[in-house]
Amino acid sequence: MNIIDELEWRGAVNQQTDEEGLRKLVEEKKISLYCGVDPTGDSMHIGHLIPFMMMKRFQLAGHHPVILIGGATGTIGDPSGRQSERQLQTLEVVQHNVDALTAQMKKLFDFGGNSEVKMVNNYDWTHEINIIEFLRDYGKNFSINSMLAKDIVASRLDTGISFTEFTYQILQAMDFHHLYTKEDVQLQIGGSDQWGNITSGLDLIRKLEGHEAKVFGLTIPLLLKSDGTKFGKSAGGAVWLDPEKTTPFEFYQFWVNTDDRDVIKYLKYFTFLTKERIDELATKVEVEPHKREAQKVLAEEMTKFVHGEEAFLQAEKITAALFSGDIKSLTADEIEQGFKEMPTFQSSKETKNIVEWLVDLGIEPSRRQAREDINNGAISMNGEKVTDVGTDVTVENSFDGRFIIIRKGKKNYSLVKLGE
């Protein structure tokens, strides 16, 4: 299957500048292509993954991805999809974010491919251009009329847009031109909101290098959930690739909780499973939706891809322990992951009677209620029912001297962190 055919089967193509020309090009040779990300934060979230998963598919097909980190454009701010100006970041913050995103990209792309990935930072060539060169060599090739007509600018004319953000499309066009002349990059991939920026780059290349230049643009559709909301958010906010921001367990849970109506679409977008395997899973969603096999496969594939085999196995173990109630099998680190979003309480390591301890923490409203719940078998500590109101809570009850898990009823878990 041609790489373009595969992208279209996966529903991953929104717009192309010249479909026939691009098809012919990728059939004739292995091309270089690029996609960029600005370092507005120190981690990507799963929404950022969408165009880069397409880059990965090109890599697996033997093409040559160039990943651009916007060390220069990140100091300016992309107006795409924004209703207001971005807050400018210091150069120190931008550099910190550049380093973090570079590490994430290398982890995702430096394995499993049939070709190497090149990482570039547009600060390296942009900072050498002075204002006179910018205006004479590049600005002269942009019509104010055409710039104003771009959706990313037109949508901001009523609320206002600074000259800084207005010129962003010129800077991105300069990136494409630089990569075309220095790295033989012929294709730029981006989200649907990048169409205007991408076509600006194509126009600049043809003006500077001649209309015979073979350059192309391709955008990815905006991914919406079946309920019409934007993909990439959980109840707790964005789902990050950084395990310190979103633990591998939380990451796994996001995917395993995918709606039946969305799971096949996500399998096509985000995994490298074959059409035959995805069709097989689609049948199982229709026939045996209660087994949630497609969701489990999606969660496994994505957790392995972003966090690795070990993190996936750990997330699966935590999930099984929470489902069965057998939390004693977990380590303290696994407890911290699995119970991160649970109600959390602080306690000293001092030995206390269970009734007083539950009331002092606020898990129980009164001693009478605490005793009643214990006598009714409604209180469990670290997976074991507490049957005696005279039980003492000691540091020996904890996971590695750090945590105690209380369950009240069938599903109400609380995480107790032990201090000094």
UniProtKB/Swiss-Prot annotation:
Keyword Nucleus present in the record's keywords: the answer is no
InterPro entries per record: aa-tRNA-synth_I_CS, aa-tRNA-synth_Ic, Rossmann-like_a/b/a_fold, S4_RNA-bd, S4_RNA-bd_sf, SYY-like_C, Tyr-tRNA-ligase, Tyr-tRNA-ligase_bac-type
What GO molecular-function term can you cite, just one? tyrosine-tRNA ligase activity
Which EC number(s) does the record attach to this protein? 6.1.1.1
Q: Where is this motif: 'KMSKS' region?
A: 230-234
Gene Ontology cellular-component terms for this entry are:
cytosol
Residues reported in the UniProt entry to bind ATP = K233
Q: Describe the function of this protein.
A: Catalyzes the attachment of tyrosine to tRNA(Tyr) in a two-step reaction: tyrosine is first activated by ATP to form Tyr-AMP and then transferred to the acceptor end of tRNA(Tyr).
Subunit: Homodimer.
Name under which the protein is recorded = Tyrosine--tRNA ligase 2
Q: Which organism is it from?
A: Bacillus cereus (strain ATCC 14579 / DSM 31 / CCUG 7414 / JCM 2152 / NBRC 15305 / NCIMB 9373 / NCTC 2599 / NRRL B-3711)
Q: Taxonomically, what lineage is the organism?
A: Bacteria, Bacillati, Bacillota, Bacilli, Bacillales
